[in-house]
Each structure stands twice: as C-alpha cells, then as structure tokens.
C-alpha cells in the first residue's frame, strides 16, 4: 500500500458536478507526481468547492494533507488529515498522514495513537510498524531525559539561592547550566513546571548582576515562542516589574531585559508555537490585551524620572520593533494608531529633551535619533490622510503647548521637538516649522549667548535646510548668520554645526555640476575644515559626528570626493568613528561612502532629450568630469586600501535602531560598488564582506536587498562559495540569489543570479535541495526560453547542475511536458556554450533515468542529426557529451541501439574509438562493445 501520495478512490456512481471535481482531483494527482505541490493543492481546493460527496471530500482533504506535508506546513497537514478522518474514521492514509504531521510538531503522544490505529487496521503494513517503533523510541528517550532533568533543575536552584555559595565557581556554573537547559523546549517546560518562574523571581530580587542575567536569560528560553508560558510568566513577575528592569543602570542587565521583552512580544503577537499547540489550553487569555499592557508600560517608562539613558534607548528600540506592521500587505495597523493616541506625546518628550537642562530626562547621544526613527516608522505605518492629519494635529498641539506660555525653556523644547520631527517624519517637521513664530525664534536663538540655546537653534536650522524650498529661504536669510557663527564663535561645538549648515546649503545642487550655491572653491574649503575636525581626537565623538554630516553633503562635489579619498587620516578617523558608541553617525558615513563610490542610481540622459531641453532653454544637469568611471574606480581602490570593508562590516553588526532600512540600503549600494571589479572581490571577501552582505540581503528596503543580493551573486560567481560563505552560511545565500530571478529585476541581475546558482548547485545535494525549496526551478525554466542568449545559456547551465537532484529528474521524466525536447533542441544550437550546457544536462539525465532515452527519438525528428553533430564537433567537451548520450541510449534499449547503428553514428564512433586515449575514445569504444554484445555488429578478426 502507498501512503505518501494522493490516493485513488473506489469506483462510484456519478452525480451532478462530480465529473469536474473528478477532473480536478486527477489534475491535482498529476501535479503532485510532478512535484508541483502548490499547484496540486490549488486543484484539490477547487475540487472541494464544487460540492463533492462526503467520500470525495475525505479523499481531497487527505490529498491536501499530503501536499502540506511536502510543503513542510505541518499544522495545516494535521488539520486537513483531521477533516478527512471526521468524514471517514477508518481512512488509514489520513491517519498515517496526521501521525506524520504530529510527529513533526513534537506531539509524539498523539502521533502514537494514530499509528496504533493504523496498525490495527492494517496489521501487516511494515511502514506503519516501523514508524510506530521509531516514535516509541523517541518517547522513551524523552521520558529518560525529563526524569534526569528533574533532579538537575532542583539542584541548580538550590545552589543559586544558597547564600553560602555567594560568588563561587559552583554558583556560576549552575547559572550557566540553567540557561543552557532553558534553550531546549523540554528543559524550558521542565523549569516552568518546577515552579521555576517564582524561583527566578527570587534571583531577580537579589540585585546581583550575575544572578539577574542568569534569570533573565533563562526566562528567555521559557517564553521563547510559547504564548501560555509567556502569559504565566508576566502574571507571576508582573509586566511592570519586567519592564522596570530595562531602566537599571547596568547595561548588560538592561540589554538582557530588552531581549526578554522582545521574546515575550513575539510570543504574544505571533501566537502559539506549533510544537506546543496541544498544551496551550492551560491558560486562556486575550493576547491583544496583554500586548497593549506591555506596550503601555514601555511608553510609561519613556518619561519616568530615574530611568537610565540606556534603558530609555532600549524601550525605544523595542517599540520600533514591536509596533509598526512588518509588511504593508498586513491591513491591520490598529496597534500603531493606539500607540499614537496613547503615547505620541511621551515619544515627543524624549525627542524634544534638551541635554544638560534642569529637570530634563536622562538620555544618551542616540536617544533623540531613536525617537525620530520611531516617529518615522509610526508615520509611515499610517494608511490614509485622516490618520496622517491626526498625527500632524497631535504633534502641532504638543509643540504649541511648549512654545506658547512656557518661556524660553519651553521654546527650546519646542524647537528641539521640531528638529526631532525633521529627522524622522519630515512632513510633520515642515508643517511644525510653519507654525507662527517658530522659524523666527530659530533665527533669533542662533545669535544667543548661551551655548545650549545656540546648539538647539543651529541644529534646527540645519535640519530645516533639507528641503529645497527651505534651503533657498535660508540661503537668502540665514547664510550670513551661519557664516558669522562659524567665524566668530569661540566654541567648536557651535562652529562645527554652523559649518554643517553651510555644507548642506552648499550641496543643494546635488551632483549637478552646473548648479553651485557658493563661489568656486568654497566647498573645498568647507570640506577641508570638516576633515580637520574629524581628525581631531580632542573633540568628543558627538561633535565630530557633525563633521561627518558636513562631508556627507559636500561629497556630492567630485572635487571634494577626490580630496577626501586622498586623505588617509580622514578616512581612518571616519572608519574609527563608525565603530564608536556614537551610532547616529552611521547614516552620514553611509551617505559619504555612497557619494564617493557614485553608487547612487544614475541614468544617462537621452541625447535627443538633452538637445530638446537646451532648445527649450530648460536646465540640464551636467556630470562632473571627475565622476567618470575611471575616477570612480580609482576612488574605490583607495577606499578598499584604507579598510572600508572592515568598517562597514562593523556597521552592519550594529544592533541599534539607528541602523535603519535606509542606512542598510546605503551600505548595500557601497558593497555593490566595491565588488564591481573582479580583482577587488578577493579583498572584500578577505575582510568579511561576504558575511556582512547576508543580513543586508535579507532585511531592509527592496532596493537595498536587491543591491546586496547582486553583490552576493558577484562574489559567488568569481570566488569559491565554500570559502566565501563557510559552514551553514552558504545555505543562507540561496534565498537572496533566487530573489534576483524575479521579473522586476534587471537582465544583468537575472544573469548573475543564474550564474551564482549554477555554482552553488554544483557543490552539494543539500544546496540543490535548498534551491528547490526556494521554488527557483520554475523561474529558471522560464529563463531557458529567454531571447537574450547569455541569460538563456546561464539558465540552461543551472538546470544542468540541478538535474543531479532526484526531484528535477522526476520533472523531466513526467509525461506531458517539453523539458526533454528543449534540451535536445538546444544541443543542436549554434551557440557552442549553450550546446555544451544542454548536452551535459542530457548526458546526466539519460544516465540517471534510462527511461528518458526511449523518449529522445519521440521529441523531435532531428534527434539523430543533433547527436551526429555533437559527435563530429571539433570541441572535445561536446564530443564527450555526445558519446555519453549515445552510450546511455544504447544501454537502455536494443531497439534504439539498432537505429543508431544503422545510421552514420556507427562510422563516426568507429573513427572516434581509434583516437588517442581520452574520455571520448573510451565512451565510443564502450558504444561499439555494446553493439557487439547486442550482435548488431561483428568484432574485427583481430579482436578490435
């Protein structure tokens, strides 16, 4: 009996609608046999919708279960099998499939019950008996593990809570063992059921750093992906208590609490872990309510006095990760709307905090930037004008409340809040700038004698210059003021900010060589001063960040780029600053590097359109002579020599909300520029570029992920993938490469992805399975029909390597498709490289699947001519592939061998067999020996 694929029903009388349902079921069966499990699933679903009989419904449900098993969606497989069993309790196939799904879900006790039922229904079925023995062994092993774990858990808690063991090595080892045990599902469950949460609460109450870290990390294991345990833990510890740990001064403890809260949030939002679904009924709660309680406490923490700056940053980081939707396809943004209504003012309070002012919140250098990012994420998550208008109204009301009637301190906070908005949701910031008196106060405070007031005002002026309309206003009204501050102020902190304002205004023309805001040479002088401050170690990192901001704007000018890459000291200072705790510098560093490598999107204008624009007296942007490819390549080499890859690798590893998706995109663009030249790729790999590109290709903006994936493809093509991506990392490369096969990507990206996948497919069966799992085969097949010869060739080469997999061989062997015909026809094309790939695939397939040999004469009448052309080719590789195909065909059938020997193939093989010793002569000789064996030809008298 077969239990792995869709079943065949017993004959039954037909009824209305049954014929179409029957056709769909048969279609689904064929698709299943071909490996198209999603297509089969669709066919079975359509058949169910046609109102089939209960018997048919049971068959269709169990067939859907088989599809879900193949697609590794075990929860749905269990559900479908259960529906089949409800219709027919004696459906042994459905019972077996449900047991397979339950086993994968870890619910072994339930899987055993189904298997016992299967054995009782079919006692002689060896498949059922073997499966029952395997699961029985797994259950016994789990029981032994759990019983031995009981004593270990009790012993570890005794050591940790014993006051006599304070600071001993024994206590440290016990805490480490507890954390390790909690990482396993069974261990976490054991700790939880052994009153572990209450005991861990006692560890938290000790106040000792080591014990608190051990407790928090153990709680991470207990709560990870398990909703009921998470709710129980929050109930015992109290949500307020857990959140309050974020605010402690110790950074390690605060980070551990941040990780725990992230895990708790994931468990609440994503729901139940599949492996423990059967045990979730212990606690019935509303996850949405628990979620809001958790977020509400985080919002309260933002404005609490006594909370550490690091704790406030961690709370903002959690809100950034928790609240906005992961994808715009998700229609529900209610959590974002709730946070805006309940907590927007609290977020603005952090963003508007004025450092060193009396009564202000404790913040770090990154706090206000994190608040800006959170505000930006919330604003971007809004779906309609009404929601955005509400956001604007709340922001404006908050700013007015401080600006009007709160004196100078209130005006400073209002202006600081506007700066925060300008760095985040700039639309809201620009609207706030238009409020009565705000811009005038900014200009007036720039001339204040108090450093704090000047800092706030100048920063607001810099951020306000971001829009062209605002920049032109400030150029007309504020440039003189900024110049006076730059030249006249005695404080470096003021001078450097004024300089950045001038830099920003000076770069308003972007890369357009013909648009210059300042006189010739002024931008070079500004850049020189920025580099001077950047290299000054005596200035704190927060102030030096502004020098990088200035360079990020000035490097639009190619002259500035050339001088910057020549200044080794400035480059080293830039890279060193990017590794510092001053995380808010990351975007500016990325912008400067994008400008230096010209890795922004640029399209050559149509010459005819340029002439038309000139005739119409319209402005036409001009490219700087030093932005030509030869200059760009030289700059890239200088950056590589200065260690840019190592610096960028450190930036990618940054766990901070400041590393936004936009920042990731900048880094992806730079990496792509760095690997453009083949000779530079070894340097990038040696400095860790391959490892850094993986997270960039998996997370970020669509453009950023595509750029990073293309850089990965370039590295995979020219470097040994096993050296570039050692260990398990090589399997992570597949998904980004497959993403480049989508039609939205350019032809070059498609081509490079195909070449990279070809290399990976030739390494191991596990990699080929990973490519198949990512559903790349249909896309690769599509590109085999591409008009562009290089893409068509690359797709064929990739398919040739994938043909080593059983699943791909099944696709070629399936009836009703032209896959084999395409390879045969391509083996006769004029493109020699395409012929080599197609003939190689044909040789492999006929070797692995002899049944395909008999189908070659059926796919085209020109098959014999194509084989003869391969045998007569001057290229030894094509000759070898041709002789192997002929040998495989002769070994598969005497009839085919007879047809071949009656043609000119015999004469060609005879000539080839007499050549010098080579794979071709050996294969040709084997063909002739097979013909002799079949008695189709006679051996020579001398035995040759």
UniProtKB/Swiss-Prot annotation:
Localization in the cell: Cytoplasm; Cytoplasm, Perinuclear region; Nucleus
One of the record's GO cellular component terms: cytoplasm
Signal peptide: none
GO terms, biological process: cell differentiation; chaperone-mediated protein folding; muscle organ development
Record region (Disordered): 1-25
InterPro entries: ARM-like, ARM-type_fold, TPR-like_helical_dom_sf, TPR_rpt, UCS_central_dom
Disulfide bonds: none
Keyword annotations from UniProtKB, A to Z: Acetylation, Chaperone, Cytoplasm, Developmental protein, Differentiation, Myogenesis, Nucleus, Repeat, TPR repeat
Complexes and interactors: Interacts with PGR isoforms A and B as well as with NR3C1 in the absence of ligand, and with HSP90AB1. Binding to HSP90AB1 involves 2 UNC45A monomers per HSP90AB1 dimer.
Function description: May act as co-chaperone for HSP90 (Potential). Prevents the stimulation of HSP90AB1 ATPase activity by AHSA1. Positive factor in promoting PGR function in the cell. May be necessary for proper folding of myosin (Potential). Necessary for normal cell proliferation. Necessary for normal myotube formation and myosin accumulation during muscle cell development. May play a role in erythropoiesis in stroma cells in the spleen.
Protein name (Swiss-Prot/TrEMBL): Protein unc-45 homolog A
Biological source species: Rattus norvegicus
């Amino acid at each position: 009996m077969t239990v792995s694929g869709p079943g065949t029903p017993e004959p039954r009388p037909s009824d209305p609608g049954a014929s179409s349902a029957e056709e769909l079921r048969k279609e689904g069966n064929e698709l299943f046999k071909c490996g198209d499990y999603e297509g089969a699933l669709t066919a079975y679903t359509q058949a169910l919708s046609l109102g089939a009989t209960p018997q048919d419904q049971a068959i269709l449900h169990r067939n859907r279960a088989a599809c879900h098993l193949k697609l590794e969606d075990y929860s749905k497989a269990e559900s479908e099998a259960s529906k089949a069993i409800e219709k027919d309790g004696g459906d042994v196939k459905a019972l077996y499939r449900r047991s397979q799904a339950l086993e994968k879900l870890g619910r072994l006790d339930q899987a055993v019950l189904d298997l016992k039922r299967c054995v009782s229904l079919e006692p002689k079925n060896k498949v059922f008996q073997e499966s029952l023995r395997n699961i029985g062994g797994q259950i016994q092993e789990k029981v032994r593990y759990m019983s031995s774990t009981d004593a270990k858990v009790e012993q570890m808690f005794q050591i940790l809570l014993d006051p006599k063991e304070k600071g001993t090595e024994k206590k440290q080892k016990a805490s480490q063992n507890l954390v390790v045990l909690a990482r396993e599902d069974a261990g976490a469950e054991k700790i939880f059921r052994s009153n572990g949460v209450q005991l861990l609460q006692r560890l938290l109450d000790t106040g000792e750093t080591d014990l608190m870290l051990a407790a928090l990390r153990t709680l991470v294991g207990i709560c990870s992906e398990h909703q009921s345990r998470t709710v129980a833990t929050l109930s015992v510890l109290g949500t307020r208590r857990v959140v309050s740990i974020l605010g402690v001064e110790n950074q390690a403890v605060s980070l551990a609490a941040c990780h725990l809260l992230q895990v708790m949030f994931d468990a609440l939002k994503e729901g139940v872990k599949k492996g423990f679904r059967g045990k979730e009924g212990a606690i019935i709660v509303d996850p949405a309510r628990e979620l809001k309680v958790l977020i509400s406490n985080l919002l309260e923490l933002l404005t609490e006095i006594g909370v550490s700056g690091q704790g406030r940053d961690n709370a903002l980081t959690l809100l950034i990760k928790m609240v906005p939707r992961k994808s715009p396809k998700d229609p529900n943004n209610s959590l974002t709307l709730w946070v805006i209504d309940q907590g927007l003012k609290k977020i603005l309070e952090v963003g508007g905090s004025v450092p060193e002012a009396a009564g202000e919140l404790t913040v770090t250098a990154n706090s206000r930037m994190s608040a800006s990012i959170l505000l930006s994420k919330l604003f971007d998550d809004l779906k309609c004008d009404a929601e955005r208008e509400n956001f604007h109204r709340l922001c404006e009301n908050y700013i007015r409340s401080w600006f009007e009637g709160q004196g100078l301190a209130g005006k400073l906070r209002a202006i600081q809040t506007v700066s925060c908005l300008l760095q985040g949701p700039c639309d809201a910031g620009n609207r706030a700038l238009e409020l009565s008196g705000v811009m005038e106060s900014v200009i007036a405070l720039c001339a204040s004698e108090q450093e704090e007031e000047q800092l706030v005002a100048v920063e607001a002026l810099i951020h306000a210059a971001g829009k062209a309309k605002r920049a032109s206003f400030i150029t007309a009204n504020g440039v003189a003021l900024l110049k006076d501050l730059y030249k006249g102020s005695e404080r470096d902190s003021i001078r450097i900010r004024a300089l950045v304002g001038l830099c920003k205004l000076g770069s308003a023309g972007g890369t357009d060589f013909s648009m210059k805001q300042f006189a010739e040479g002024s931008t070079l002088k500004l850049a020189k001063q920025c580099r001077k401050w950047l290299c000054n170690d005596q200035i704190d990192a927060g102030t030096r960040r502004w020098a990088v901001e200035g360079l990020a704007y000035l490097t639009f000018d190619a002259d500035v780029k050339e001088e910057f890459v020549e200044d080794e000291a400035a480059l080293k200072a830039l890279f060193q600053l990017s590794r510092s705790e001053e995380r808010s510098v990351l975007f500016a560093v990325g912008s400067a590097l994008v400008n230096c490598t010209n890795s922004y999107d640029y399209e050559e204008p149509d010459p005819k359109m340029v002439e038309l624009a000139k005739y119409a007296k319209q402005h036409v942007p001009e490219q700087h002579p030093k932005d030509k490819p030869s200059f760009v390549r030289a700059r890239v080499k200088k950056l590589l020599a200065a260690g840019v890859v190592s610096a960028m690798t450190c930036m990618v590893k940054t766990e901070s909300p400041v590393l936004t998706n936009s920042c990731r995109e900048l880094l992806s663009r730079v990496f792509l520029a760095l690997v453009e030249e083949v000779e530079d790729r070894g340097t990038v790999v040696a400095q860790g570029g391959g490892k850094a590109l993986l997270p960039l290709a998996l997370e970020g903006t669509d453009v950023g992920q595509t750029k990073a994936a293309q850089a990965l493809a370039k590295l995979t093509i020219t470097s040994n993938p096993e050296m570039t991506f050692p260990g398990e990392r090589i399997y992570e490369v597949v998904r980004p490469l497959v993403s480049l096969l989508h039609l939205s990507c350019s032809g070059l990206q498609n081509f490079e992805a195909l070449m990279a996948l070809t290399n990976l497919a030739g390494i191991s069966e596990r990699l080929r399975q990973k490519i198949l799992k990512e559903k790349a085969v249909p896309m690769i097949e599509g590109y085999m029909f591409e008009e562009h010869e290089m893409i068509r060739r690359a797709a064929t080469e990739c398919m040739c390597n994938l043909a080593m997999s059983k699943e791909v061989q099944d696709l070629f062997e399936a009836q009703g498709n032209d896959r084999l015909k395409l390879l045969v026809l391509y083996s006769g094309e004029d493109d020699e490289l395409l012929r080599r790939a197609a003939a190689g695939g044909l040789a492999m397939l006929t070797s692995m699947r002899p049944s395909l040999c008999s189908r070659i004469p059926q796919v085209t009448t020109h098959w014999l001519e194509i084989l003869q052309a391969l045998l007569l080719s001057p290229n030894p590789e094509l000759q070898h592939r041709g002789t192997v195909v002929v040998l495989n065909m002769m070994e598969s059938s005497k009839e085919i061998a007879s047809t071949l020997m009656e043609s000119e193939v015999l004469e060609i093989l005879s000539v080839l067999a007499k050549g010098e010793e080579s794979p071709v002569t050996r294969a040709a000789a084997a063909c002739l020996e097979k013909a002799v064996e079949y008695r189709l030809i006679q051996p020579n008298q001398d035995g040759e």
